[in-house]
Amino acid sequence: MPEDRLVIWPAYFDLERSRGQGRRVATANAVRNPKLEDIIRASKDLGLDPVVETEKCYPKNWYEQPGRVLVLKKGSKTKTLRSIARALKKRRS
């Protein structure tokens, strides 16, 4: 994996998951059942040049919802996740 990119899994934004199950954003910014396509659109809107890897599976839940997104590293991972989460929330409302 290139060092100029961050790995983004849909589980990071899933309102149904606990932090222990892989959610990385606050419940106020999380969405129900985030789709890979939604994350891609939100990342494009933020200018993060997303690259999709559909064959990859989240290690904690290797048996469900395959796919991850690699985005440009433009700051800390936490700030990037918050930005994507806000964009996802905005698209859903």
Curated annotation (Swiss-Prot):
PANTHER family: SIGNAL RECOGNITION PARTICLE 19 KD PROTEIN (PTHR17453), SIGNAL RECOGNITION PARTICLE 19 KDA PROTEIN (PTHR17453:SF0). It is found in: Cytoplasm. Part of the signal recognition particle protein translocation system, which is composed of SRP and FtsY. Archaeal SRP consists of a 7S RNA molecule of 300 nucleotides and two protein subunits: SRP54 and SRP19. Belongs to the SRP19 family. Involved in targeting and insertion of nascent membrane proteins into the cytoplasmic membrane. Binds directly to 7S RNA and mediates binding of the 54 kDa subunit of the SRP. NCBIfam families: PRK00754.1. GO terms for biological process: SRP-dependent cotranslational protein targeting to membrane, signal sequence recognition. Keywords: Cytoplasm, Ribonucleoprotein, RNA-binding, Signal recognition particle. This is Signal recognition particle 19 kDa protein. GO terms for cellular component: signal recognition particle. It holds the Pfam family SRP19. HAMAP family: SRP19. One of its GO terms (molecular function) is 7S RNA binding.
